[in-house]
Amino acid sequence: MDPKATSTSKTDNIDQITIIEEKVNKIGTEPTIRKYSKGRMLGKGGFAKCYEVTNLENKKVLAGKIICKASLTKSRAKQKLISEIKIHKSLRHSNIVEFEHVFEDQENVYILLELCPNQSLHDLIKRRKRLTEIEVQCYTLQLICGLKYLHSRRVIHRDLKLGNLLLNDKMELKICDFGLAAKLEFDGEKRKTVCGTPNYIAPEVIEGKGGHSYEVDTWSLGVIIYTLLVGRPPFETSDVKQTYKRIKACEYSFPDHVSVSDTAKNLVQKMLTLDPSKRPSLDEILQHPFLKNANNIPKFLPASTLACPPSTSYLNQFASPENSVKVPSQPAPKSAEATPLAAQKNGRFINTQGSNMFGSEKTLVTSPHSATTQAHTNENVVLTSQLDRHQTQGEKGWNFTKTGSWQSNLNGTQSVKGSSRPQTVQQKGDLKSAQSLKAPALLNNLGSRLRVSGSAVGSNRGQVLSGNEVWVKKWVDYSSKYGMGYNLSNGTTGVFFNDNTKIVFNQKTDQVTYIQRGKNDRQDTVTHYSLTEYPKDLQKKMTLLQHFKKYLEGSEYGGSESINDGTETQIGVYVKKWVKTKNATLFRLSNKTVQVHFTDRTEIILNSENKQVTYVARKETEPISP
């Protein structure tokens, strides 16, 4: 007998907690109740909403896709849901989101899926704008592995897009959302349903006359590769009809201002061919020069690539000797320009920080539709020149059989262990950041969101940082509503808002600086005001700035830490990007300093100006838990 469920909710003094109760009926035994707590929303689509769901019995955290039965009044919608469940439930592959469980009650259908905390490639492109070719190669190989499995099971996905490609806590790519997928009954069968997402849809689907098959996924894969390399889909326009017109004419080009290799262009051109029969098979794609040398492509990318491109030293590990980029013996840690890591339009990255189960692209349906990745270190060595090499342990190389399948032996990860004393070392390469991107629970009290790098480590930090160094002294995470407020060591107070704007108060000059991203991602727009004179549309943000300032300066944390005056050029330093992960909070300042504050109260500060990496240990008397 299929399990049934009922859902109830209870409210405490802080937040409303919704408990989903599943009544499990087993033959020969009394019914049992399995309980889940419903957490933050991860995304939503036309018929469903996705939430973080925790099994209260085993504490396993899942993604719960909840479909309201009231939206399934039409028989076609019901059949679509049944088909999605049937297809997804039958799939088991490392590059496909795992189907855990399904049950229902009188109001909803609940589909429990593997949680992918590092979000989707759509979210990644919003932050990074575009990826390096080695990253595109890595994700493409994983996607092809998943597609080969699907096609071997006679399944066409039919809605491949960046929003449906998720990253789990190990940075594995996972295909999700089988709402438009089709299961063919026999080889050579064609489907004629017009379905998909406008920017990714294949021309034969739009035409609809001769039907379509597996080749539509190949077309979408070509669009995905182009989008990852360039930063926007090849046929995108402001009008869907115009987009379809360009797709049917295969009208696109590579922009001159973006550097794309000839081999990458050639592969995309072969895949974006109007005649489906002339598109390369998945095995032929694997043999293309862009992907053929799989041993020089990492199997998984470091979590730092969620925020910035791989460093030159990291890339050189996978480059052939003749193509290796020559670098100085001790270069500064690379810090690339990237889109801020705070919330975009929907605030999902910092605000909810869950995987985007549905993406943000509009899907069209018409009829005849880690484990944390961490640096591997010795107990007595915190940062060494070998960090980049550790970055790829268990990640390097693809081993394809004749059918294109691959086997991996991913080495187990180790926790980062710090020495008992602060130390400053020269370091090349980039540091792998922690991965599992989970926001803290929503709290009513602003004070309860305070996180401080203050007095407990402040004295230690002072021993290893120069007098004109600037760092984040303390901060408060209120991104569930507004943003993140912070104090710098030079006395500056700032707020990084969820809409990616920033406001900074200089206590020496009483000047307020407001920073907005320029149109078309060009240079930021910077305007200056005072605390008393500013435009009316900044009233709310100015009020929030003063609230954050008052709270941080009056908090009990870090009060004994002296302010580092800094130099005049450093007074303009502010937090340009930030991200909160499961094991750390990362800040990138406008002077390109990168600060990582781990949950065990240790810190790492990377200074690109003086090519210095500073490690700050916690005090022996300080508890490990924050």
From Swiss-Prot:
Keyword Transmembrane helix applies: no
EC id: 2.7.11.21
Tissue spec: Embryo.
PROSITE patterns according to UniProt: POLO_BOX, PROTEIN_KINASE_ATP, PROTEIN_KINASE_DOM, PROTEIN_KINASE_ST
Cross-referenced Pfam families: Pkinase, POLO_box
Function: May play a role in the division of some cell types.
Family to which the UniProt record says this protein belongs: Belongs to the protein kinase superfamily. Ser/Thr protein kinase family. CDC5/Polo subfamily.
UniProt protein name: Probable serine/threonine-protein kinase CCRP1
Organism from which the protein derives: Zea mays
Gene designation per UniProt: CCRP1
